[in-house]
């Protein structure tokens, strides 16, 4: 479709979902005026995917202001577009294609942990993410958390009907708080229908990367803004009569010790866990435990086939209460392990436990199963180093040094060895005492592109 006063100067290519604007029609806030005509300092044509368009406003019969996320600078950008044949028609068309099937001007409550990770969450929100939402005419109510569990207490009492979503600007710890605040409500089933999203701003940003595939806050914000309600599994965690929810991992062994045992290194960001890992490689492994698991499969070929099948299924855009029960098929069986030579026990729901750590290559966001990795301490350094070098792409899935399971639930009992060890739930420290986890299929909701988390090849 052609929208310019001259042929092909302003054109929408619907098959490519792309807007093309000739450089002669574009000017930016920093541009100068020559004879009252804006002269662009960027002497290139503008090509914007429909998805990247945030908003468009009429400024005159033949001119508009256009806000979009730049593919090159990856930030919210604003420009003026002149020589439009009919600005009313142009604005209506662009907003229709930019938000096709998606609610415009969403309302969010935003939790920001100003002290989490490297302490940059507030700056990240204000300089990178917020401009995307404000340019899209979204309403954002910001809450700066002041203490531990502050976000949890607000989420527990939140009027969920007043918002279209929750934004968590921080790391996985803040997201864990929000999830558990919703989980403590009497109406938790209804509350969990409210999408909970993450803008990366902490030392661990795993959920954000799993849900959007983006690292940059502005691009993450764009994916959320243009995202559709998407279900994801949770785990219920029970310990001494207390209940919590997990969206990511439950782990014991060297990974938990590297995570929780390096809390005082949070200023290092995601690098703290890697330093902790290498330091602990030179310590004698002495993790012991008893595990009982309701196993669906321990055959990696079969697990891969299950995963490939789930990849080919059409993504679900909305979850219903009827979805939130554990399927009775495929069949499962109980297995019990007494492990005196453990290196890693890690149970998870999503592929990435960090943006560069694909711990569960066969995990999908809503398959109703928990992925479990067990690594024994035989050939301790060799097996862990081999695994570590392939962690970024999940290549260790085929390693002979690990055991991989798909389970519905498990009961875990640590054995006291006299050494100080840790247990971590979503990267948060929990008592090192017996506990039980069960999958809660499709209980959580987020805003994700194409109504589904990206499932990559194993």
Curated annotation (Swiss-Prot):
One of its GO terms (biological process) is sphingosine biosynthetic process. Pfam families: DAGK_cat, YegS_C. Its EC number is 2.7.1.91. ATP binds at residues 113-115, 145, 177, 202-204, 266, 272, 426-428. GO terms for molecular function: ATP binding; ATP-dependent diacylglycerol kinase activity; D-erythro-sphingosine kinase activity. Keywords: ATP-binding, Cell membrane, Endoplasmic reticulum, Endosome, Golgi apparatus, Kinase, Lipid metabolism, Membrane, Nucleotide-binding, Sphingolipid metabolism, Transferase. One of its GO terms (cellular component) is plasma membrane. InterPro entries: ATP-NAD_kinase_N, Diacylglycerol_kinase_cat_dom, Lipid_Phosphate_FormReg, NAD/diacylglycerol_kinase_sf, YegS/DAGK_C. This is Sphingoid long chain base kinase 4.
